[in-house]
């Protein structure tokens, strides 16, 4: 799990959304990923299916140019966001 302050995650996700042209839902999924939530936890939190979460995560990876969660956190960190 990645540890950082709640407000910090929200503001950094908002900045990432602008930087990478994320949808509002992708931004929400990103915030939950950064809080350490699993795919199934994200699905329950957002009232969507696991497949929908998987699609949002795939879109996050594509838009940010990464291939995994750790790399996603690094990519955002590289932009001065995390």
Language model: regions and residue ranges:
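Basic, Lys/Arg-enriched C-terminal extension of HTH/homeodomain DNA-binding domains
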Residues: 4, 13-17, 58-82
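Regulatory hinge/linker segments at domain boundaries
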Residues: 2-28
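Recognition helix of helix-turn-helix DNA-binding domains
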Residues: 36-71
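Pre-recognition alpha-helix immediately N-terminal to the DNA-recognition helix
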Residues: 27-31, 71
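Short helix-to-turn junction characteristic of helix-turn-helix DNA-binding domains
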Residues: 33-37, 76
């Amino acid at each position: 799990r990645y540890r950082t302050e709640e407000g910090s995650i929200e503001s950094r996700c908002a900045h990432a959304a602008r930087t990478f042209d994320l949808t509002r839902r992708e931004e929400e999924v990103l915030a939950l990923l950064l809080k350490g939530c699993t795919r199934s936890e994200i699905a329950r939190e957002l009232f969507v299916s696991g497949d929908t979460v998987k699609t949002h995560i795939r879109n996050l990876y594509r838009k940010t140019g990464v291939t995994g969660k750790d790399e996603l956190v690094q990519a955002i960190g590289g932009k001065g966001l995390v």
